[in-house]
Amino acid sequence: MGLQTTKKITPFLTFDRQQWAKLRKSVPLKLTEQDLKPLLSFNEELSLEEVSTIYLPLARLINYYIEENIKRQTVLHRFLGVKSPKVPYIISLAGSVSVGKSTSARILQALLCQWPVERKVDLITTDGFLYPLAILQAKNLLNRKGFPESYDIHRLIKFVSDLKSGERNIKAPIYSHLTYDIIPDRYSVVDQPEIVILEGLNVLQSGMNYPSSPHNVFVSDFVDFSIYVDADEALLKSWYIHRFLKFRCSAFSDPNSYFHHYAKLSEEQAVKTATTIWDEINGLNLKQNIVPSRERADLILVKGEDHAIQTVKLRK
């Protein structure tokens, strides 16, 4: 198979770009440059070559897993002698702030909804399960946003549990990056799709991340296939600062933006502010809560300097 060999004991098979790209086989690329543009995050560039090299082999692998999952469900139904409700295949996608989780999730959604057959693929972000801004302020958690304690984890677990129970018209709260808050009385409604992609910082976390709120089940208990998007922290920090600078001249300039006051910063002040936010919040959360969950993933995508994925690690 051309796998990289290593003396280190690991539960993962490791592929470089060229080795992974060969696993695409005959999967067709149906996306065009025009299709790709709206899938990219504000500060991210990604080519069709990256889609072909990395995401098409991944889509092929996931489709194999989905086929096996359907067979397993058929066996279970036959054994139990009952017809269970339709339940979606759940894919979780985790990683740090600024690593490009949202772009990866949207590309996967676009590929899986049209190959090998047309099917319904819903994308839900766990941002919607953050506590509303007023509650975070009341609990003095504003500077802990994104940390485990800032999420209504019981509501999130109830959501994924309902998905796996075959419930219909399940509501997921919607988060606004403009107002930095949950949008009141607005929801995404999930109604028995074939696949759900659940994207967020916390989808691989376990009980060790919620010591003050013990419970017996976690989001990962309901996930069929988990992905972690990885990169060196120095790269993540530089990407975050770069994104902050671009937002300063765009989204932050909107008077309705929660971060409107940052639009008035000079470039030097903006770099200093973004660096402080990273060091005191995002970087700390990365080290304490996000990186420790990485090894629980079924597949790890490792990015290099240009945001391109250089290495793929697949659980054996």
Swiss-Prot record:
Keywords: ATP-binding, Coenzyme A biosynthesis, Cytoplasm, Kinase, Nucleotide-binding, Transferase. The keyword Transferase applies. PANTHER family: URIDINE KINASE (PTHR10285). Belongs to the prokaryotic pantothenate kinase family. One of its GO terms (molecular function) is pantothenate kinase activity. This is Pantothenate kinase. It is found in: Cytoplasm. It holds the Pfam family PRK. One of its GO terms (biological process) is coenzyme A biosynthetic process. InterPro entries: P-loop_NTPase (IPR027417), PanK (IPR004566), PRK/URK (IPR006083). Its main location: cytoplasm. It catalyses: (R)-pantothenate + ATP = (R)-4'-phosphopantothenate + ADP + H(+). GO terms for cellular component: cytoplasm. Its EC number is 2.7.1.33. ATP binds at G95, S96, V97, S98, V99, G100, K101, S102. Pathway: Cofactor biosynthesis; coenzyme A biosynthesis; CoA from (R)-pantothenate: step 1/5.
